[in-house]
């Protein structure tokens, strides 16, 4: 009887522990909130999202965070080996905030769409009619043309570093080459990356010693050692990570990418374009300025698009300028015309190339009808520093058709064509491309007028 009495008292004591005034926060809730706050700080440090209402990732983060706040306000009560959650006074407001945020977010997504803002999407780019013979300098010698594509640059760049045992054992050449104008000459530049987390930990105090510079005209690559080591890199971790460093310096900015460039003295800088929306809250994002980061010192400086230094080449990304042209070509006649009528609708082809002219880097791409045939109705060129855009009404074969035609001429050799460059031969728009073997070595080149078949030539 005595033992049974003690058991009943023990059970009663357990009920008293969990029995607290309903609707109030208890010790479990306080612990949950502390864990949540710590988790939020860890997430922000790891992901470093932009704290900006024009960022969809920021909205997702906020909705999840408020939902977790609501979860932390629940009161978990134990009754007869059953665990039940009971809402407190703070749970319902948190739930309503989540519902309202989701509803507002969906409304803003709809209000930012092409359906309601077609004219704003179409007006992001100003297209001028260009004169091909005047705008594009005439090419007189093949050996003065930059014909190297990125895959070939990677091969040559890795060879330049491969002979340096102390470098190649700790670092690897980035596959992201930037096409730049370096003191009047077209160049491709790539950073060195840490070859994994362990290599970063072993070398973080020494930093990255240099970068790779590739000459696409001479087919040469050089490893350039910097006076000061590169401390901030996309391949670094913790506080040395370039993205984290720049985003935390400008927490409200929405960054579009990070591109390595060189100033006139050969010093490396990362160009970080900043985006803002022009249609509703989320739509029609375009570059409003750039943050220039010195990766050796960590110093950063913001410039509006109109105030960017002349040595900077990549304010706009090639994908972005082509996207803006597509919006212009498809939505100038209104949204419903782009869906059903397609009257006057046009868009860029699937890829683009780079052309260095007058100290700037331009993107060129074919323009075709939305009906999707294998011919171009013209081509467009966009300046990646100023955003200036020109359209040339020159009909002919689209780039991939020219590549396929060139490969057909040497199909017995099995060579593959690179994406063509656009040149001016006696006032005639002409594609020129290299033909490579299975090992990626350049064997021949092919010339193709926009409206004729290609003529392959041996590189010798």
Segments from the language model and where they lie:
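Membrane-interface segments at or immediately adjacent to transmembrane helices
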Residues: 115-189
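Membrane-embedded alpha-helical segments of integral membrane proteins
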Residues: 33-81
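Single conserved hydrophobic/aromatic residue that forms the stacking wall/gate
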Residues: 451-460
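Exposed beta-strand-loop-beta-strand "reactive/processing" segments of non-cytosolic proteins
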Residues: 168-204, 257-291, 349-381, 418-445
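Internal/C-terminal transmembrane anchor helices
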Residues: 89-114
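Membrane-anchoring hydrophobic segments
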Residues: 1-47
